[in-house]
């Protein structure tokens, strides 16, 4: 199956093509297949797996976004065996090979094939009354330490997502030792750091937020809350005079955001995001809140409304008279980050193959830039190009290309908001690119590529000599682990910018690790192998996250 997909579609976004375009091309010529029945227990298992593994790309209601529409109207035309094979083998365009990687058992693959042929489950809403029942303050502010009670270099701590165990590991970046492992929500998507640097806020895909106090002798969660059934984003207020006052969380389901007290996570307001698409003005039931960032120019949170293509500037200076500014941008907004000046925000509209540039000082759209197939930058990578000046880089899920966009409209206006150069990487399935102001290297992962050699290694470019192409670092081999896919995901620098950390992400039943590379020499420096490091994915250095260094 994989050879067939690769041969027909190469590095294009094959998952979208196969699940969407094939139906359009053949339509009713594909025979209707009877839906194999699911028992109640099987449906519950399938629904749980879908929410944990699939909803992020395909949507809670399965109507598609980064991934294609997989409602039964489409999947039944493809048929059970076709769907089962696709789940098993994946595609070079970003669809993981759930079966051959070992992430799902053969039984689970079979259940999921039947699940996506079945009618869509309607999830419940999650209102303020529901949210309040989950709110817990384990350590009230008045009982927390007045000053730091440990000897850790807080700015060089890494918060590491342990995806499938519902935990984060805090790792000392100086000693490479695990400080503690903290129970959180399931599959923490991101860690964000308060303006003061004292607190780490983490949010699980199940909508649970934990607030971790780094001043404690052993850092731990001091408050928690569940803001929805499915979520991806959390942020804190950072504008001068408003530091640490508020936190905000954005939900995939229900489509809403919640602003909370920054000391306790007490929910203060809940605002729904349902509305019309920016272009066709069609009402949408599921405009999910994707990335949220804190403005450097005024007391505002800036958030992406994925399906409807709008970016909201939410003024948190007066919650009782809430003011929002809506920027009409592009549909299927996902993630992104600031340029070097932190004035302009670049966000990926990945299903539209575009990057949206927003001027956060003026709260206006600056430009929309066409890039390669399904851009997925994480927060992107800023560096000084030897020819074009400051650029921001994004890799892609759908092909092997890395797009470099000029980001200096003041001193290099001729290059601003244009793709000034395109680099060719190892393949599709990339989730993150990363560099550092002190680094001469640009690192590109390919974690979701179905080719094991590509998924288990990293491409690295010399910023001063991009024409040379990339070198390959065999991170999976360096880990010493022999089993599994050993997907290498999310390069992350330490505070000093002289080390880069990589997650070696295996299935829950297999060994995983963290590999640390000397940035200057590109040589292996250290491997963290510990039975507590289970399915590590995202890693967030406190200093770099707090100061938007990427």
Residue ranges and their predicted role:
Residues 22-49, 143-146:
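Electrostatic cytochrome c docking/interface patches
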Residues 177-182, 218-225, 266-271, 275-282, ...:
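A short beta-strand motif characteristic of beta-propeller blades
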Residues 226-307, 320-328, 333:
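Asp-box/WD-like beta-propeller blade repeats and closely related beta-sheet repeat scaffolds
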